[in-house]
Amino acid sequence: MATINQLVRKPRQATTYKSASPALDKCPQRRGVCTRVYTTTPKKPNSALRKVAKVRLTNQEEVISYIGGEGHNLQEHSVVLIRGGRVKDLPGVRYHTVRGSLDAAGVAKRRQGRSKYGAKRPKS
């Protein structure tokens, strides 16, 4: 416990909020252009080929974004929408692409959890 004299000399520091997705600049999403679309491997206990894209945002920041779902139509110069949300087993990937928006098509033949993958409601 600090004494009153110590607190007079140096007041308590308020804890500063540190954003988990700083490139979004406090926006819910951001638009960007894919500069490179590639696959990468996850950290130690897991094994896969995860689809990611390097994206240059409208605020000139370059970020790595994860492309969720099975199959995608993204390539270089595709315009995508980026949201926050990291991928735990991919170091440096702190953003997700929004499927079904701009150039990123929704996941085909998706029946459950469709809203997360931009899939339309199937014709019964």
Curated annotation (Swiss-Prot):
Q: Out of the domains of life, which is the source? A: Bacteria
Q: Where is this region: Disordered?
A: 1-25
Q: Which residues carry this modification: 3-methylthioaspartic acid?
A: 89
Tell me if Nucleus is a UniProt keyword of this record: no
For this UniProt record, the keywords arranged alphabetically read as follows:
Methylation, Ribonucleoprotein, Ribosomal protein, RNA-binding, rRNA-binding, tRNA-binding
SUPFAM superfamilies found in the cross-reference section: Nucleic acid-binding proteins
Mention one GO biological process in which this protein takes part, according to its record: translation
GO MF term set: rRNA binding; structural constituent of ribosome; tRNA binding
| GO terms for cellular component | ribosome; small ribosomal subunit
Keyword Signal listed: no
Q: Tell me the subunit arrangement.
A: Part of the 30S ribosomal subunit. Contacts proteins S8 and S17. May interact with IF1 in the 30S initiation complex.
Q: What's the family?
A: Belongs to the universal ribosomal protein uS12 family.
Q: What task does this protein carry out? A: With S4 and S5 plays an important role in translational accuracy. Interacts with and stabilizes bases of the 16S rRNA that are involved in tRNA selection in the A site and with the mRNA backbone. Located at the interface of the 30S and 50S subunits, it traverses the body of the 30S subunit contacting proteins on the other side and probably holding the rRNA structure together. The combined cluster of proteins S8, S12 and S17 appears to hold together the shoulder and platform of the 30S subunit.
Protein name listed in UniProt: Small ribosomal subunit protein uS12
Q: Per the UniProt entry, what species is this protein from, by scientific name?
A: Xanthomonas campestris pv. campestris (strain ATCC 33913 / DSM 3586 / NCPPB 528 / LMG 568 / P 25)
Q: Which gene encodes it?
A: rpsL
